Amino acid sequence: MHLSEITHPNQLHGLSVAQLEQIGHQIREKHLQTVAATGGHLGPGLGVVELTLALYQTLDLDRDKVVWDVGHQAYPHKLLTGRYHNFHTLRQKDGIAGYLKRTENRFDHFGAGHASTSISAALGMALARDAQGEDYRCVAVIGDGSLTGGMALEAINHAGHLPKTRLLVVLNDNDMSISPNVGALSRYLNKIRVSEPMQLLTDGLTQGMQQIPFVGGAITQGFEPVKEGMKRLSYSKIGAVFEELGFTYMGPVDGHNLEELIATFREAHKHTGPVLVHVATTKGKGYPYAEEDQVGYHAQNPFDLATGKAKPASKPKPPSYSKVFGQTLTTLAKSDRRIVGITAAMATGTGLDILQKALPKQYIDVGIAEQHAVVLAAGMACDGMRPVVAIYSTFLQRAFDQVIHDVCIQKLPVFFCLDRAGIVGADGPTHQGMYDIAYLRLIPNMVLMAPKDEAELQRMLVTGIEYDGPIAMRFPRGNGIGVPLPEEGWESLPIGKAEQLRQGDDLLMLAYGSMVYPALQTAELLNEHGISATVINARFAKPLDEELIVPLARQIGKVVTFEEGCLPGGFGSAIMESLQAHDLQVPVLPIGVPDLLVEHASPDESKQELGLTPRQMADRILEKFGSRQRIGAASA
């Protein structure tokens, strides 16, 4: 049987180990070819090929349910559930999603994108099953990185108190999340995976037996079960931890040995209470470049499969916002020992790896623990430090209560730097940074700012570190505009003060962050049609520069706002609230992301679909304010 013939995972039933190994080879081949062409998550899926095959051979997936944590390791799952023939559309607009989606396939039982949710979801399904008198298996597959998240531990604590609830947790232990895992639990798991004294003892005994004349080989072969028993004795400590929490513990199991995996899963399915199967895997298995660089090959842009190198860009690009952030923060930290960068398992993605290498004592990685990261920062701020929490916009949502309760109520100088704010592209709705303006703007004592380009980001970094209270800066994914970047001597910005970039009499255009340059381009298009616009770089969404904005709105009488975020509660809402508070009744056109989920596509495709290109925005402005001539029609 070929992988291309599999449309239902139950087709794996009855296949021999040799046949499964052949399908596993085909999965890796298709996985590598596709990600090399489209980009996507590489290492996670390559590491769970055998795990997926063995698990699915022992389940009846017409009835049983598997929940994959995060979802970036679920490409083999997708290939075994009827998506082989359109897998080439992975992460493309209207194609296969990079994560799990309930609406995409009936075997995607729970959507995901953020970490540590799988055990809670699978336990919920198990409790629903029992409440309705049904009979099927519920399985959560979770990585050791996700297990550092508090929600996963909360779910384990709950499940362990339900001895009659049948639940299987498969711990995919590859000693990695995106970056190397941190924390006591991860260190403990790693001790269990590689117990050096026990390894040396068993290897030494094996070598000694092999040297016995005539019978050494036979004795060595007979010693193998004893050797495995000695190793498992060294593993018993971690098992004791889970057993004390109410789980039956099985493992560690070689995550690339199909026979051992199948036997273990079959045994696990016999239990009637919560079971944890500990599977040791290698991230990037089967592709040498990914095995050697597990951080770099966690996710990849399109690359050359033969060399493992990224495909060259058509022309040199400016540095990314993340890189400018990391370099600038590191420079500032060298002269200010109060500065400490904090990340939640995203050092490379946020640019904090630059700080980590240069000033490791001023860098903290808390693991996948956003709530802890925020309160840790609050505690450090209490005692004189200047913590900088570098985090993706979408992940700060997970610590919303802590931002309010532990930072803003106490007016502590914690600086939130929100990477991937706005449209992020192929990762889809779980990762779009749409909501931070709205959910942070409503909190008292919080200051919000966003740079128009990478040079202004440098100045805002200084501003945030100097500010004696809660403050947040959002910036987009990807490369900067390409403006000159001073290497030092950055000046702070006055809090709540905007910048006028263009003078005009017909229209007031107020732009925030990444939408400033598109607003300027829109103004140029409107100027070709006889409409002159004043363009303001707002810089701050809270507080607004009302001394500048309100008189201009009163004078000009027509207002357009621009933001790369959700319109409900966002920057445009802030402007309208301000104008209303000043009893100013002028027409306002808010431009941004409407009340919908932005699906996976390239950023340019998403902006086109949302009407956020300069030409589309100019057309909307002409339509709103009375011109019948459209930009597109006029220039056709």
From Swiss-Prot:
GO terms for cellular component: cytosol. It catalyses: D-glyceraldehyde 3-phosphate + pyruvate + H(+) = 1-deoxy-D-xylulose 5-phosphate + CO2. GO terms for molecular function: 1-deoxy-D-xylulose-5-phosphate synthase activity; magnesium ion binding; thiamine pyrophosphate binding. Thiamine diphosphate binds at H72, G113, H114, A115, G145, S146, N174, Y287, E370. Belongs to the transketolase family. DXPS subfamily. NCBIfam families: dxs (TIGR00204), PRK05444.2-2 (NF003933). Catalyzes the acyloin condensation reaction between C atoms 2 and 3 of pyruvate and glyceraldehyde 3-phosphate to yield 1-deoxy-D-xylulose-5-phosphate (DXP). Homodimer. This is 1-deoxy-D-xylulose-5-phosphate synthase. The gene is dxs.
